[in-house]
């Protein structure tokens, strides 16, 4: 019942109990109250006995007092959608947090929506070229697919997401939505300013911008972090349905969505499941991931960073996410320790598109050969560590030499990492990537030194670097 009035009876951190005299508001309804002049939104999570509901606050509850009046809005949290949100930073309830004008949108949408019906979904498979060699060659991304970047702390997930925004969103003519879920505020601020510098956001003419940002950062209460991914997704769905184009949806970090859900679950008094996660982990993840899909109107290509606690891919949070993805890019600390960036594990990363009928026979064969050489090198590493290179057969020595070149050739300088590397970023076309690796596997460049393959683009750059190294040594 809209506009029904209730009053606060109990406040435990982010959980607020509200008592109503008559009919109770529905589960997931938004309630509003005034907290020292600021509007506070509460979302109904449980119906208790005695005419009470238990709600989750979308902002800090400091200053809230018992007996305070609360109003039922009669609907779930609704946010402004459409072109009015372009170039703006929104919070979980759709309010601008970029110190700009209030957002005046023609349409608002509830953040809780059903997933599209099966007969509305599209099943086409097309490769999305990123310009990053290791991804395009070994675990290609699907247009309108779901992509996960898995990695522990500090192996480069956010840098890789930024580079993908740089490579895809800047040349991509459609719209992008970036949801910052429980990550560092500094990174959110940096991203906003980088987008202004690269003209993706046009502060003088916001309607011409190509991206909308939705932030619920580390300092926010768990209610906001558990819902902000849905806020971003609702914006992306509206752009997909309205424009009928490919919308890019970036989420950094999907693990924080699960983590916030676990905090909320504990506050609601649910009995925890494996490793302390919420018992509804698979349901929460499924409800969100099933909405990220391509329909006959348009598509959403989502790229999600997934933090891996303690580098353990079997942890329930990353393991539940794996099931929903079309392509997984696994970042490995051992590779980043070698100084190879992006630290993508070529043997652990996978893609459903790696099929000769989709990527073509040549691409499939080159990728298989590259992985075979790297796998052989991995199995020889114990022998090398104990007995040394001299004990290997001539054939194995050649395999190791090629594998080390391939390993270094899979590194690449990024535009967004220019401040760290001091060199300009490069993008490599898919044709160039396939031809270059085919030649390396065939042994055409066995005479070039290993160092020439490190942090370059295509094979022409390798040859130029090798000549420069030879000239410097002479």
Curated annotation (Swiss-Prot):
<keyword id="KW-0139">CF(1)</keyword>
<protein>
    <recommendedName>
        <fullName>ATP synthase subunit beta</fullName>
        <ecNumber>7.1.2.2</ecNumber>
    </recommendedName>
</protein>
<dbReference type="InterPro" id="IPR020003">
    <property type="entry name" value="ATPase_a/bsu_AS"/>
</dbReference>
<keyword id="KW-0547">Nucleotide-binding</keyword>
<dbReference type="InterPro" id="IPR004100">
    <property type="entry name" value="ATPase_F1/V1/A1_a/bsu_N"/>
</dbReference>
<comment type="function">
    <text>Produces ATP from ADP in the presence of a proton gradient across the membrane. The catalytic sites are hosted primarily by the beta subunits.</text>
</comment>
<keyword id="KW-0375">Hydrogen ion transport</keyword>
<dbReference type="GO" id="GO:0045259">
    <property type="term" value="C:proton-transporting ATP synthase complex"/>
</dbReference>
<dbReference type="Pfam" id="PF00006">
    <property type="entry name" value="ATP-synt_ab"/>
</dbReference>
<dbReference type="InterPro" id="IPR055190">
    <property type="entry name" value="ATP-synt_VA_C"/>
</dbReference>
<dbReference type="InterPro" id="IPR003593">
    <property type="entry name" value="AAA+_ATPase"/>
</dbReference>
<keyword id="KW-0066">ATP synthesis</keyword>
<comment type="similarity">
    <text>Belongs to the ATPase alpha/beta chains family.</text>
</comment>
<dbReference type="GO" id="GO:0005886">
    <property type="term" value="C:plasma membrane"/>
</dbReference>
<dbReference type="InterPro" id="IPR027417">
    <property type="entry name" value="P-loop_NTPase"/>
</dbReference>
<keyword id="KW-0997">Cell inner membrane</keyword>
<dbReference type="InterPro" id="IPR000194">
    <property type="entry name" value="ATPase_F1/V1/A1_a/bsu_nucl-bd"/>
</dbReference>
<dbReference type="InterPro" id="IPR050053">
    <property type="entry name" value="ATPase_alpha/beta_chains"/>
</dbReference>
<keyword id="KW-0406">Ion transport</keyword>
<dbReference type="InterPro" id="IPR024034">
    <property type="entry name" value="ATPase_F1/V1_b/a_C"/>
</dbReference>
<dbReference type="InterPro" id="IPR005722">
    <property type="entry name" value="ATP_synth_F1_bsu"/>
</dbReference>
<dbReference type="Pfam" id="PF22919">
    <property type="entry name" value="ATP-synt_VA_C"/>
</dbReference>
<keyword id="KW-1003">Cell membrane</keyword>
<keyword id="KW-1278">Translocase</keyword>
<dbReference type="InterPro" id="IPR036121">
    <property type="entry name" value="ATPase_F1/V1/A1_a/bsu_N_sf"/>
</dbReference>
<keyword id="KW-0472">Membrane</keyword>
<keyword id="KW-0067">ATP-binding</keyword>
<comment type="subunit">
    <text>F-type ATPases have 2 components, CF(1) - the catalytic core - and CF(0) - the membrane proton channel. CF(1) has five subunits: alpha(3), beta(3), gamma(1), delta(1), epsilon(1). CF(0) has three main subunits: a(1), b(2) and c(9-12). The alpha and beta chains form an alternating ring which encloses part of the gamma chain. CF(1) is attached to CF(0) by a central stalk formed by the gamma and epsilon chains, while a peripheral stalk is formed by the delta and b chains.</text>
</comment>
<keyword id="KW-0813">Transport</keyword>
<dbReference type="GO" id="GO:0046933">
    <property type="term" value="F:proton-transporting ATP synthase activity, rotational mechanism"/>
</dbReference>
<dbReference type="GO" id="GO:0016887">
    <property type="term" value="F:ATP hydrolysis activity"/>
</dbReference>
<feature type="binding site">
    <location>
        <begin position="151"/>
        <end position="158"/>
    </location>
    <ligand>
        <name>ATP</name>
    </ligand>
</feature>
<dbReference type="GO" id="GO:0005524">
    <property type="term" value="F:ATP binding"/>
</dbReference>
<dbReference type="Pfam" id="PF02874">
    <property type="entry name" value="ATP-synt_ab_N"/>
</dbReference>
């Amino acid at each position: 019942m809209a506009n029904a009035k209730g009053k606060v009876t109990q406040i435990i951190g982010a959980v607020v109990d509200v008592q109503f005299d008559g009919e109770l508001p529905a589960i997931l309804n938004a309630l509003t109250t005034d907290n020292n002049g600021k509007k506070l939104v509460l979302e109904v999570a449980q119906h208790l006995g005695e005419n009470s509901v238990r709600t989750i606050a979308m902002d800090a509850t400091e200053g809230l007092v018992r007996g305070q009046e609360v109003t039922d809005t009669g609907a779930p949290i609704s946010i402004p959608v459409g072109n009015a949100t372009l170039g703006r930073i929104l919070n979980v309830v759709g309010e601008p947090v970029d110190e700009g004008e209030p957002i005046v949108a023609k349409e608002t949408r509830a953040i809780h929506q059903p997933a599209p019906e099966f007969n509305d979904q599209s099943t086409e498979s097309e490769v999305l070229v990123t310009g990053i060699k290791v991804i395009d060659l070994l675990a290609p991304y699907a247009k309108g697919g779901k992509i996960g970047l898995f990695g522990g702390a500090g192996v480069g997930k956010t840098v890789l997401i930024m580079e993908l925004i740089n490579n895809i969103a800047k040349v991509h003519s459609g719209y992008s939505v970036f949801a910052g879920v429980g990550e560092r505020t500094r990174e959110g601020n940096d991203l906003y300013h980088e987008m202004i510098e690269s003209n993706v956001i046009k502060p003088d003419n916001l309607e011409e911008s190509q991206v909308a940002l939705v932030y619920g950062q580390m300092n926010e209460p768990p209610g906001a972090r558990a819902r902000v991914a849905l806020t971003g997704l609702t914006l992306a769905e509206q752009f997909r349905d309205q424009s009928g184009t490919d919308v890019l949806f970036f989420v950094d970090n999907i693990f924080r969505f699960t983590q916030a859900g676990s905090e909320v679950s504990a506050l609601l008094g649910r009995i925890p499941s494996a490793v302390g996660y919420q018992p509804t982990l698979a349901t929460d993840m499924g409800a969100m991931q099933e909405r990220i899909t391509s329909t006959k109107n348009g598509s959403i290509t989502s790229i999600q960073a997934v933090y891996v606690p303690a580098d353990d891919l079997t942890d329930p949070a990353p393991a539940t996410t794996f099931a929903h993805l079309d392509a997984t890019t696994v970042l490995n600390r051992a590779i980043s320790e070698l100084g190879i960036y992006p630290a993508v594990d070529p043997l652990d990363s996978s893609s459903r598109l790696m099929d000769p009928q989709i990527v073509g026979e040549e691409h499939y064969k080159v990728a298989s050969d590259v992985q075979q050489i790297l796998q052989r090198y991995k199995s020889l590493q114990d022998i090398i560590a104990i007995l040394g290179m001299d004990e290997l057969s001539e054939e194995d020595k050649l395999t190791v030499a090629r594998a080390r070149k391939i390993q270094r050739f899979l590194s690449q300088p990024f535009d967004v990492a220019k401040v760290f590397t001091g060199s300009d970023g490069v993008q490599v076309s898919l044709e160039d990537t396939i031809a270059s690796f085919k030649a390396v596997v065939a042994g055409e460049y066995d005479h070039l030194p290993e160092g020439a393959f490190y942090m370059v683009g295509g094979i022409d750059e390798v040859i130029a670097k090798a000549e420069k190294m030879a000239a410097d040594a002479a």
